[in-house]
């Protein structure tokens, strides 16, 4: 489907390598870091609209490197300006600005496990809380008392949103 959309846009040709994978949730598709880079690709709205349409998304972003002492996201918005996303995972809603906060999709089992190992009466200290990867499941599913520590102001905003959204 993506290849067909690119061929339609470029007169039957594919001017460069297409991504073989991407992440899709809500109304956004996130492409790998190296996708659609280089002189062969005209990086303008018609390209991004075609890619988003082929992937069934309204917004399109491209992964970047996590950097800095705050571990800030390097995600770049390609289509759409609103970078706020909500992911629901194991009954927990995580909201964050994807161009400013990272989300570690690979820790899904640990996030779920935190809701299983924490229980009412437990006191948990989450020293690197981020957007609430472990804090929120410990509260939502475990009922523990959690002291969450985070120094990235954008992650703190997202964590506060998650606390409100998850009750």
Give the location of each predicted region.
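Generic alpha-helical secondary structure
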Residues: 3, 40-48, 156
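Flexible, active-site-proximal loop/turn residues at the rims of small-molecule/cofactor binding pockets
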Residues: 35, 66, 152
């Amino acid at each position: 489907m993506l290849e067909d959309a690119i061929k339609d846009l470029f007169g039957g040709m594919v001017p460069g390598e297409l991504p073989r994978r991407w992440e899709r949730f809500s109304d956004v598709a996130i492409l790998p870091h190296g996708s659609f880079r280089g002189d062969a690709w005209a990086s303008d709205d018609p390209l991004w609209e075609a890619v988003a349409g082929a992937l069934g998304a309204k917004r399109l972003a491209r992964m970047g490197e996590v950097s800095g002492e705050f571990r800030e996201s390097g995600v770049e918005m390609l289509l759409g300006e609103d970078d706020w996303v909500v992911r629901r995972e194991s009954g927990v809603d995580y909201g964050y600005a994807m161009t400013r906060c990272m989300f570690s999709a690979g820790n899904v089992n640990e996030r779920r496990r935190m809701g299983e190992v924490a229980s009412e009466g437990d006191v948990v200290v989450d020293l690197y809380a981020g957007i609430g990867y472990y804090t929120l499941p410990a509260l939502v599913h475990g009922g523990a008392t959690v002291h969450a520590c985070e120094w990235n102001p954008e992650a703190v905003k997202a964590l506060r949103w998650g606390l409100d959204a998850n009750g």
